[in-house]
A protein has these predicted regions:
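Extracellular recognition modules
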Residues: 1-6
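Ser/Thr/Pro-rich, low-complexity mucin-like regions
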Residues: 7, 125-128, 161-164
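Short, exposed coil/turn segments at beta-strand boundaries within extracellular/luminal domains
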Residues: 7-15
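C-terminal edge beta-strand
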Residues: 15-25
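Activation on beta-sandwich/Ig-like modules and their edge loops
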Residues: 25-156
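Extracellular low-complexity, O-glycosylation-prone Ser/Thr/Pro/Gly-rich "stalks"
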Residues: 149-150, 155-180
């Protein structure tokens, strides 16, 4: 939301001068790093990840790595070093190289990091530290990871609009998604 106000002296306001942007940054009010904002786990190879920059600054993607862990593994089976700059408020989409044309056409990168099937943890790291994740590394849920009224298999998950901070705790993180 954008509100405009200006101080006139000490006791009145005008509604036409100073634009102030109110960021939707979650309950803690922090938007200090990238987050996974959308997860697509569709039929066959129709899979994609969207990364969002909720910060007020453009972000160099060089220190970031996206990883996927398979079936309870403690080491990633696929990883992708991110490249470029993600503008403030912008998103980048990582698509499966064998996905249908609509996913491929919207992807800024095609990567095997999208080879997941609902029970595989997805991790976003910065300088080696986890800043956001879905699922739990080293655990196999014996099905798909639960998310709201759905799961990480055969659904599209979109981060709730009031979430501006990544989660490293899946018990908390699984409540941060709208399920489609």
């Amino acid at each position: 939301s954008v509100f405009e106000a200006a101080a006139l002296g000490c006791d009145s306001l005008s509604s036409n001068a100073l634009p102030v942007t109110i960021l939707q940054c979650g309950s803690a009010g922090l938007c200090d790093d990238l987050i996974i904002s959308e997860y697509v786990e569709g039929t066959s190879n129709n899979k994609a990840l969207e990364i969002h920059n909720p910060t007020p600054f453009d972000v160099d993607l060089t220190p970031y790595v996206m990883e996927v862990y398979n079936n309870g593994s403690e080491t990633p089976i696929q990883s992708l070093n991110l490249e470029g700059v993600l503008v403030s408020g912008g998103v980048t989409v990582l698509g499966n190289p064998q996905a249908a044309a609509p996913i491929i056409n919207q992807s800024q990168a095609l990567s095997t990091v999208t080879w997941y099937n609902g029970n595989d943890p997805i991790v976003l790291r910065k300088n080696g530290e986890i800043i956001d994740m879905m699922g739990v590394i080293g655990e196999d849920p014996l099905g798909a990871w639960p998310v709201g009224e759905g799961a990480m298999a055969e659904y599209t998950l979109v981060r709730k609009p009031n979430i501006g901070q990544g989660s490293t705790n899946w018990l908390e993180g699984q409540t941060q998604w709208d399920v489609y």
